[in-house]
């Protein structure tokens, strides 16, 4: 890793070794999240905790150096999510400040007073970011939230004031829309990485109590969890976050799972967008009717269906319309069959009538259902007896 060796005599050698280490460790190893496969809710969160815990702890002074890798804009300036000041690394480090753009410092986006400023949380780069000193000071240890009537607005549009989000009326700090998802995923990381201790943080300050419950799941008060879910949805993972996640993996040897897998937010907490699974790759074969006993062989391929929707008409194949993703069909001519059954009996039909059937595979459920409708849809017709 980039900091496994602490002392180098020759500066040129230090630069070479750090660069080489970063190149080797920027991406997670194959199978990094295997232990989380197939889990959801609290079990998934605990599996992720076991994957990302025991990170390499850095010193507080080293954060200044780390920011030069984790939070550098394309123009070489500090990537400050609280201002548009254009800080230069090292040269503009705080120090004292009186006004916005005086200097940048080390912002605990998850306020350090909430966990009593103790290690390893106080130097965990996944919630520490370089920000304008003045704006950081105005934010103080207030929770994130939405503000309709700000008492303070920063140069880039961050706001401080009474919370306008339902469920809380205290003072909050609202970052700009471009970074709300970044901060939400930072908080999901903190709730997961420190699930072994976070249950005791709610009593450390009034502000912490407004956001945290006294448990390790679901961790957050309902209003705040809903807020984070909305921010996560409306500001999806950006290339900035992906690059930062890779850079921090090279430094800390752990990752933010909710950047690598945004769907984990829904799978753990049930907020944010439901993951959209890929549609089944193939249709089932041998689809046929025997006295309105429908039979088929299940679809195969890398992505298997969760089930099938069979649509029926007594007019023609053309009268059967393709289903729409996200819609459930429960009418008298629609039949849902789970994957693996490979048959359906349909009874109480009119005698001496020809019925037409089409079969659509799907993945997911509810509003997240995704039907396969392209290509040649399996169809069959069958006439009932007298």
Where are these regions (language model features)?
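Bacterial N-terminal signal peptides that target proteins for export
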Residues: 2-13
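N-terminal signal peptide c-region/cleavage motif recognized by signal peptidases
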Residues: 18-23
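N-terminal module-boundary/linker segments of secreted carbohydrate-active enzymes
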Residues: 24-87, 268
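Pro/Thr/Ser/Gly-rich low-complexity, intrinsically disordered linker/stalk tracts
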Residues: 272-307, 351, 366-386
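Recognizes extended acidic, P/S/T-rich segments that occur
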Residues: 309-351, 364-375
């Amino acid at each position: 890793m980039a900091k496994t060796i602490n002392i180098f005599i020759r500066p040129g050698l230090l630069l070479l070794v750090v660069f080489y280490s970063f190149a080797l460790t920027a991406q997670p190893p194959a199978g990094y999240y295997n232990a989380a496969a197939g889990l959801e809710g609290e079990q998934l969160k605990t599996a992720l905790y076991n994957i990302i815990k025991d990170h390499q702890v850095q010193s507080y002074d080293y954060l200044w150096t780390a920011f030069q890798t984790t939070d550098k804009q394309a123009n070489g300036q500090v990537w400050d999510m609280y201002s548009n000041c254009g800080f230069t690394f090292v040269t503009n480090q705080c120090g004292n400040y009186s006004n916005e753009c005086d200097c940048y410092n080390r912002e605990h986006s998850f306020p350090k007073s909430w966990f009593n400023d103790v290690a390893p949380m106080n130097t965990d780069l996944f919630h520490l970011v370089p920000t304008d000193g003045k704006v950081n000071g105005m934010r103080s240890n207030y929770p994130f939230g939405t503000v309709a009537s700000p008492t303070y607005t920063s140069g880039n549009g961050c706001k401080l004031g009474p919370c306008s989000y339902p469920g809380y009326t205290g003072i909050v700090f609202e970052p700009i829309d471009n970074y709300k998802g970044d901060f939400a995923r930072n908080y999901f990381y903190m709730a997961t990485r420190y699930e072994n201790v976070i249950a005791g943080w709610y009593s450390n300050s009034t502000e912490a109590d407004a956001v945290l419950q006294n448990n390790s799941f679901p961790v957050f008060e309902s209003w705040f969890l809903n807020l984070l879910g909305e921010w996560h949805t409306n500001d999806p993972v950006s290339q900035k976050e992906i690059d930062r996640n890779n850079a921090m993996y090279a430094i800390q040897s752990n990752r933010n799972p909710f950047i690598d897998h945004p769907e984990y937010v829904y799978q753990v907490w049930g907020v944010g967008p439901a993951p959209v699974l890929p549609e089944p790759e193939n249709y089932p074969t041998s689809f046929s009717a025997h006295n309105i006993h429908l039979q088929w062989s299940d679809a195969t391929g890398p992505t298997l269906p969760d089930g099938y929707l069979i649509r029926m008409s007594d007019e023609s194949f053309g009268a059967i319309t393709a289903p729409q993703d996200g819609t459930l069909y429960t009418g008298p001519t629609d039949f849902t069959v789970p994957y693996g059954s490979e048959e359906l009996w349909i009874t109480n039909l009119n005698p001496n009538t020809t019925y037409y059937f089409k079969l659509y595979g799907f993945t997911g459920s509810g509003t997240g259902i995704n039907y396969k409708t392209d290509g040649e849809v399996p169809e069959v017709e069958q006439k009932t007896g007298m």
